Amino acid sequence: MENKIFSGDSFFTAAGNVDTMSTEPLSVVFLGGSLTSGDIDYEGTSLTDWNMKWPNTVLRFLNGLFPSREITAHNAGLGGTGSQYGAMRFAKDVLAYSPDLIFIEFSVNDMPNIHHERSVNREGCLWRQKFLENIIRQAMNCEKVPAIVYVHLPVPALIGSERNLAHRLSCEFKEDMLRYYDIGTIDVYDVILNEFECRKKMDSSLTLQEFLKQYYHMYDSGVFDVHPHAWGYKLFNLAVVNALMKEPQKYLRPFKMRKDIYCKGEDEIVNRTFNYIKCGDERIKYTGDWKIYTAENKLVTDNSFLAIPDGKYTNNNDFPDGIAQVYMPKDEASFEFDTEADAVCFPHVSSKLGLGSTIYADGEKVGEFTCFSNYQGMNYSGDEIKLPKGKKHVKVKINNPTETATVFRYGYVVEIFDK
């Protein structure tokens, strides 16, 4: 503990004032899902306006707060990232940048299934809580311990609705643990409600639904898309920056280095570690018509989701280390590797037809997953595949039982080591 450096100590003087004279470089990382990356609005299109992304607005604020510090920022937002995948990504996509300050946003993607009973939702929240604590413990183990700010971005829903209750439950479970570590939190949902109350004073007939429609797209079903209009993103920006501006000491400071974990009896998950195997790593052997695409050899696709030599759309922006793709007329393909991991995960896979994959360890079936076929091709259901103890040979077999030719893609294998 004596040898650790706490980045949060560098933000203020001994008198408690913002240290505007410090010239120390400042590294800031933002970790979250699509609302952090700013990749899409409600229509699924790219947010091209730099000012719309809340991390960029925060960065602009920090540059004003610390005018003498050279600030570098990395946006590690990636669509669909919640606490589980965030824990897997933390070392590779956050700690690799030696951050002094980290902003985390998972509350939307961590929202439990609204169709489950509340008791089941509680179990889901507890499960995600363990991975968020894993992230905090990873940060604690750094020689330079970063400051952390947690941001609750909202799910637009009517108060008391199933969707609203599920989201608030997710936030409540996080708040309990974040208080244990004395990590500051910013709740944008509260800001939205305050804005609604202010508007209602001017127009007593205004309903919450009509108010939300000014910021979000509402479908015919009455459900709002979680990706807002441009004005919704601006509301995020104002909420986060105003909180930081009002009480910087509340957020820009070290968190408590707790010896005991919060999630009692869950040491296996809270203290686990992760390793990424890139799809182009020599450890992985392929069977089938596979190709590896990198930043220099980009995967370009058309709307048919099949790879073409030239085109307008690129799908590997999220995979700077490469994408492996196999063209499958109707037969099977596979990739295999040796590992001593306790489990493996394939967090981002895609196929146009929703192909099924079966995982074997030393010839015995240990799990399977189905690839979703949305535009980013993400798979988060049944992520972790438990493996036998010790060294084993893992084979992933992809099946195409249809008569239609298609492709399968993936970016990484994540090795999971329990402690």
Predicted features and spans:
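Serine-esterase "nucleophile elbow" of acetyl-processing enzymes
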Residues: 2-76, 91-98, 343-348, 352, ...
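Active-site segments of SGNH/GDSL-like serine hydrolases
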Residues: 109, 136-172
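Oxyanion-hole/transition-state-stabilizing segment in secreted/luminal serine hydrolases
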Residues: 29-30, 37-44, 83-126
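Conserved catalytic region of serine esterases and O-acyltransferases that act on ester linkages
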Residues: 2-7, 209-419
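Structural recognition of the beta-strand scaffold that forms the well-ordered cores
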Residues: 27-31, 72-77, 101-106, 147-152, ...
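Extracellular serine-dependent O-acyl
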Residues: 4-13, 147-152, 168-219, 234-248
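Alpha-helical scaffolding within the catalytic cores
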Residues: 11-17, 56, 84-96, 120-123, ...
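The substrate-binding groove and active-site-proximal loops of carbohydrate-active enzymes
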Residues: 79, 117-127, 159-165
